């Protein structure tokens, strides 16, 4: 908070404070859920009806155009030398804080899908979009952080990808979602939704000539 007082534009301070506040809200909601319902003993690979869980949602024509209007960074500037790379851009991790009507509709629909998939109320920690262009990608990674380990939340955290535009798949690197442990390759289709444990490593490489657009969400089940 001190850093923000000294420099209101200090982006990292804003970002870190936002993360801490969301983590605090998450723990509070989990505690409330424990009090209102006896916590069942699930394992993450049993909580999902399948791992990965695959569904579909029709993509609104105006959704993609709205994403292009939202502030974003070049992929090489988002995770310098670490995660995403190449041509393209990505939003911050608060996509669903935008008030575009279509984005709010998408948020509502995805929340319903997530709740049904993990059989629990959920809490969204991060929401974002990626626009991949020729020669872009994301290296193998997962979405587990120290906070999850410290608070025993590994089995309650999940990741979602929602493919809005699959781009150009007539190339050597069509943007296949590569999951590990166990290995599985998924060629996205328009409107495809994939949900899997956040601990599962995954990657993608894209070489098409047309933009490949997706929304990502990292979320927790409350029970």
Show where each model-derived region lies.
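Catalytic core of non-heme Fe(II) oxygenases with the double-stranded beta-helix
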Residues: 119-206, 211-214, 218-222
């Amino acid at each position: 908070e001190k850093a923000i007082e000294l420099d209101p534009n200090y982006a990292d301070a804003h970002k870190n404070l936002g993360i801490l506040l969301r983590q605090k809200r998450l723990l509070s909601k989990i505690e409330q859920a424990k009090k209102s319902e006896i916590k069942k003993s699930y394992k993450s690979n049993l909580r999902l009806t399948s791992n990965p869980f695959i569904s579909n949602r029709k993509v609104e024509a105006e959704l993609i155009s709205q994403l292009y209007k939202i502030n974003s960074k070049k992929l090489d500037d988002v995770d310098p030398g670490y995660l995403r790379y190449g041509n393209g851009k990505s939003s911050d991790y608060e996509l669903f804080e935008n008030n575009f009507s279509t984005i709010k509709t998408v948020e509502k629909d995805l929340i319903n899908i997530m709740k049904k998939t993990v059989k629990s109320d959920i809490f969204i920690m991060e929401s974002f979009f990626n626009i991949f262009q020729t020669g872009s990608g994301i290296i193998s990674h997962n979405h587990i952080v120290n906070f999850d380990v410290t608070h025993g939340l590994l089995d309650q955290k999940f990741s979602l990808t929602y493919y809005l535009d699959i781009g150009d798949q007539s190339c050597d690197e069509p943007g296949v979602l590569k999951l590990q442990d166990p290995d599985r390759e998924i060629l996205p289709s328009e409107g495809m939704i994939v949900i899997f444990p956040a601990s599962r490593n995954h990657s993608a490489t894209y070489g098409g000539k047309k933009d490949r657009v997706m929304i990502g969400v990292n979320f927790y089940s409350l029970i």
